[in-house]
Amino acid sequence: MNKRAQSRSAARLAAVQALYQHEMEATPVAQLIHEFHQHRIGAIIEDAEYADADVPFFDDIVKGVLARADEIDAAITARLASGWTMERLDRTMKAILRAGTYELIARGDVPVGAVVSEYVDVAKAFFDGREAGFANGLLDAIGKDVRKK
């Protein structure tokens, strides 16, 4: 993986963490982004080194998800199984799906397959294979919905 791809992968992981924090604590977006810029991205915390991330890409994902939350949640909800709601999803999975869906909707410069693959990898960092498969299927379906040619 080249340096640009690595920095984008790190940005995606950091964005999911930031979105999770926002969901848990309702941290204002400016404060949230500042905290990640100053204390998380590229830092070493408890002997874990956080990779350098593509900071503008991180900012775009976090701000974009929060600005377009209703549109993103509607796209996800449309692909959930009957009887499922956003509230039923684990908060980490919700952050993964929201970030991935934002990229599918707003970042036409990133291929669908790359978005799906990247967020499946993020899901694997937090969950076992079943949840990663869930993220894969849902993001792939959303990609087909929003990137119709």
Swiss-Prot record:
Descriptive protein name: Transcription antitermination protein NusB
Family of the protein in this entry: Belongs to the NusB family.
Entry GO terms, CC: cytosol
Keywords: RNA-binding, Transcription, Transcription antitermination, Transcription regulation
Protein source organism: Sphingopyxis alaskensis (strain DSM 13593 / LMG 18877 / RB2256)
Gene3D superfamilies per UniProt: NusB-like
Superkingdom assignment: Bacteria
A GO BP annotation: transcription antitermination
Main function: Involved in transcription antitermination. Required for transcription of ribosomal RNA (rRNA) genes. Binds specifically to the boxA antiterminator sequence of the ribosomal RNA (rrn) operons.
Any GO MF annotation of the entry: RNA binding
InterPro entries: NusB-like_sf, NusB_fam, NusB_RsmB_TIM44
Membrane-crossing residue ranges in chain numbering: none
